[in-house]
């Protein structure tokens, strides 16, 4: 019966050998270990929170870029349409328009309206026209096709626009093709 009682209550002091080390760890060591673990977990938490914030910012930027630049290839293809429409209208001389029959005049007016409407729709999607006539040449926005001697304007000024350029957001969709002055005062 004593054996049963000892098994239920665990070993008593009489069963523990004299001089054996105590089984309980030092409370100061336990405290130091817990503080170190706490510091480590806080550090991991702060790093995880920072990673999540960076991921959120990066995702927001990617979504904004997708909205802004998602139509880039389509818009670039549509520029050919805009150029052709503009060239078609530019090739009808003003006197021919004035002498044209009313049906032809209505057709020309309809094409002009279509050109303006198309340009406004491009702008609605963030595509803006670059018309740099009279501005200083900027290789980021313009493509110089030729230089032209012109003493009346500063050197490096855009004197002629062969084909307008376009930007979408902060990016160049197509640089403006221009002629640049040479020989004037430094600009």
Swiss-Prot record:
PROSITE patterns: GRPE (PS01071). GO terms for cellular component: cytoplasm. It is found in: Cytoplasm. It comes from the Bacteria. Its main location: cytoplasm. Keywords: Chaperone, Cytoplasm, Stress response. GO terms for biological process: protein folding. Participates actively in the response to hyperosmotic and heat shock by preventing the aggregation of stress-denatured proteins, in association with DnaK and GrpE. It is the nucleotide exchange factor for DnaK and may function as a thermosensor. Unfolded proteins bind initially to DnaJ; upon interaction with the DnaJ-bound protein, DnaK hydrolyzes its bound ATP, resulting in the formation of a stable complex. GrpE releases ADP from DnaK; ATP binding to DnaK triggers the release of the substrate protein, thus completing the reaction cycle. Belongs to the GrpE family. NCBIfam families: PRK14141.1. PANTHER family: GRPE PROTEIN, GRPE PROTEIN HOMOLOG, MITOCHONDRIAL. This is Protein GrpE. It comes from Methylocella silvestris (strain DSM 15510 / CIP 108128 / LMG 27833 / NCIMB 13906 / BL2).
